[in-house]
């Protein structure tokens, strides 16, 4: 069984390469995309088509609902599930997506968490009735840890308080005593190299297709069902559409421009992250990369 990862900025063609290679190299695909994990967020996440999902087994697509939290621990569980099924069915595994933080965590690992008692969980749950107060408590317990998160990050505030009340250690001290353990540090990473002008054109074209496919209708349905509160509803493409529905963005052309601009800014951040976090990657243009991966999978 071979494992590879394909990374690159949003709209660079990662999913297309992955599906093509998977069909030729007997592989399953694990999606590393922070929006594709959500059911019902289909158009704005640019998920693989229904035909592609039928053709190649995918993990990490439609695994939870927009009002539920998706954690890195959940991603690591999905990875283990994908790996086990690949071994069972004698398949290779292709990891692909723009949320490279999850891939980085797969390589560096995360600190193991203790089992939290029912008493501790109940106590923290009560404290979290007032998230602002919970954050202030965390600031007193561990100013260093609190500085790394926002006062609205309920998930990490909860984790910090759970660790403290379960172990008696400030989260920073706990993580120092329990360093991360790598899960798989030997994954070969391939990156799509693409120039800014070409990428911007691809982003603009994809944004137009999203709107034509019914992006606005999708967001209306999501807002009605889940409200605007979940973190997933603050994603690029969703927040701009909500502004359009509110009248803050005046017309479709301006909506396209806003989504394209923010997506291009995201792409730049993704490229910076990939450049600084993954040292031993192979970066090639689309066609060259596909050829290189096919050769590697055949060896």
Swiss-Prot record:
Keyword field contains Nucleotide-binding: yes
Swiss-Prot/TrEMBL GO biological process terms: tRNA modification
Gene3D superfamilies assigned: 1.10.20.140, P-loop containing nucleotide triphosphate hydrolases
Positions with a binding annotation for substrate: 10-15
Record keywords: ATP-binding, Magnesium, Nucleotide-binding, Transferase, tRNA processing
EC number assigned by the record: 2.5.1.75
Cofactor(s) it depends on: Mg(2+)
Job of this protein: Catalyzes the transfer of a dimethylallyl group onto the adenine at position 37 in tRNAs that read codons beginning with uridine, leading to the formation of N6-(dimethylallyl)adenosine (i(6)A).
Protein name: tRNA dimethylallyltransferase
Organism (species): Nitratiruptor sp. (strain SB155-2)
